Amino acid sequence: MLILLLIPLLGGEISAQWRTDSLKGYEQRTLEMKPDYSGPVVATLVHRIASGTRHRAVLYVHGYNDYFFQKALGDSIVSHGYSFYALDLRKYGRSLREGQDAFEAKDMTEYQEELSAALRFIRSTEGHSEIYILAHSTGGLITSLYLHDTDNRDGVRGLILNSPFFDFNFTPAQERFVLPLLSGAASLMSNKVVSDVSKEPNMYAQTLLKAHHGRWDYNTNWKKTYGHPIRLSWLRAVRDGQKRLQKGLNLRLPILLMTSDRSIRPEKTWRPEYNEADLVLDVSDMWRYGVLLGSNVRGQSIHKGQHDLFLSSDSKAYDMAYRVLFEFLDQCSASTPTH
């Protein structure tokens, strides 16, 4: 009873029961967060149902304009002997509530409340002693900062970064002049939209969706094919987080940095090579800043990989992403002391 009374004070109250998820073989539960500047917020913890007792677990954290739908990823991790959880952050996917502005954020540290609640639940309630974080794109920025700011108080054993969002994919002139100007303007007009939805499905979405040139189906209300209005407040929040990370974080845990082997700036006309590169971010930025995360960073570029490497169209790139992931997990696990 005392624990139940303390949970709301600690933040991240978790609903009492698992509920059936839309993905077959998965379940979900709600994490109640403290209200923010726009009102009530929640996060959602998703779990792959599995038999037997497991002490190792992976927590997946998605990127921007995204949510967890990669069923094959969770299934494979469970088949490899790990428990699998995914976190839909506040105002994303399963956690988006009526009236909320999707993906709204004013500081990357806002998400630390649900990360802390999820990790605490996986360890203390579910009984996992060995936890790894697998994070994609903006999730890679968020989780890297979280591990630094909390000094990894949760005892995470390893961090896997899948095409992390460590810098904006702008031209040098935009980086030097436009981005600081926009970031500074956020204090005066934070709700100003600086990038609106596109008239045509964006090229990255076309590389993913079966309806276009990809291999996957997902909820396009949660992962928007035409994008979503980007406000100055969100841009400044991301930029402030990136500037902190780019100074170095001194993380003291094994880190795997995974990227495609090249980036392409897509044009308006479809080209087959778009299915064989990162269309969203510049992979050179990931490497430039990834090595500054800590002293134990290993990396792998994947030939013909896409921005989300675990959604790659090229079969060899897709298979290699899994092979690299499991090699890293098993190496980390083998070096973990047993109690």
Regions found by a protein language model. Give the residues of each.
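Alpha/beta-hydrolase-fold enzymes
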Residues: 138, 143-232
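Short beta-strand element of the alpha/beta-hydrolase
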Residues: 55-63
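N-terminal cap/lid segment of alpha/beta-hydrolase-fold proteins
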Residues: 14-52
